[in-house]
Amino acid sequence: MLYELVAYGIAQGTAEKVVSLINAGLTVGSIISILGGVTVGLSGVFTAVKAAIAKQGIKKAIQL
């Protein structure tokens, strides 16, 4: 479950950055921007984990 959240968060954040890069045209900064997308994705993972904790209770979330 946790790995799925991580993969989803990274994919979503990276996809958003890739789309914006394609629209802006690929440059040397594109690599940095894609890495930024991974960071955004990880923050999305933390949000999802917080939601899981709130929804299922701390004990269940720790078992993830």
Curated annotation (Swiss-Prot):
Residues 1-4 form a propeptide. One of its GO terms (biological process) is killing of cells of another organism. It is found in: Secreted. It comes from the Bacteria. Displays a high degree of stability when incubated at temperatures between -80 and 75 degrees Celsius for 60 minutes. Autoclaving the peptide at 121 degrees Celsius for 15 minutes had no effect but incubation at 100 degrees Celsius for 60 minutes caused a 32-fold reduction in activity. InterPro entries: Bacteriocin_AS48 (IPR009086), Circ_bacteriocin (IPR020038). It holds the Pfam family Bacteriocin_IId. Cyclopeptide antibiotic that inhibits the growth of Gram-positive bacteria, but has no effect on the growth of Gram-negative bacteria. This is Carnocyclin-A.
